[in-house]
Amino acid sequence: MYFGKTRQSDQSGRVPPNQNVTTSFPVLHTGDVPYYEDMTKWNLQVYGLVDHPMLLSFEDVKAFPRYESKNDIHCVTGWSRLDNVWQGVRACDIAEKAGVKEEAGYVILHAEEGWTTNLPLDDFLAETSLLAYAHNGEPLTPEHGFPLRGVFPHLYFWKSAKWLRGIQFTKENHPGFWERNGYHMRGDPWQNQRFTWD
């Protein structure tokens, strides 16, 4: 499934349990890869329990302060990729601009084709949480989420939704696509939270 892998024991505690390091960047998703020929037709909706709902163009997103984060990512299928450098907007900056209401406790990320995933609000607001439009200094490719994807490196990588179209703040925790199909509601790789029963 992927190449250039090494054993986790070589990585001095940087790799969670039952993971192997790869130097490639595997592409995993359901459905078709969307291609945007006209970016004026793309937008990001920020809504739910917020004081200021927003409908952001790609240029609006890029007008937020640019943030760079270097981190490791861990896929629930068993691979880890180290030293990724992402550029984008801090998730907390989006939340601050929208004015998240006190009763909000969770976030639902909406992507193309109706795909969703859920996050506790604290995970969305974490210092390392990013809405990325570039990886290692280059714009995201369509296969890796162009124009915008979530990056939540402290959780399994399925939580880092590709092809983002909406950020919804909610009071209750609603399971997303993979969570409805048996994946863990939070997905902490260091706790090996892969499936509902973990």
From Swiss-Prot:
Binding site for Mo-molybdopterin: 75, 144, 149
Coiled coil segments of this chain: none
Record InterPro entries: OxRdtase_Mopterin-bd_dom, OxRdtase_Mopterin-bd_sf
Cofactor binding note from Swiss-Prot or TrEMBL: Binds 1 Mo-molybdopterin (Mo-MPT) cofactor per subunit.
EC number: 1.-.-.-
GO terms, molecular function: metal ion binding; oxidoreductase activity
Biased composition (Polar residues): 9-23
UniProt name for this protein: Uncharacterized oxidoreductase YuiH
CC cofactor: Mo-molybdopterin
Organism: Bacillus subtilis (strain 168)
Top-level taxonomic group: Bacteria
Gene3D superfamilies: Oxidoreductase, molybdopterin-binding domain
Keywords of this entry: Metal-binding, Molybdenum, Oxidoreductase
Stretches the record annotates as Disordered: 1-23
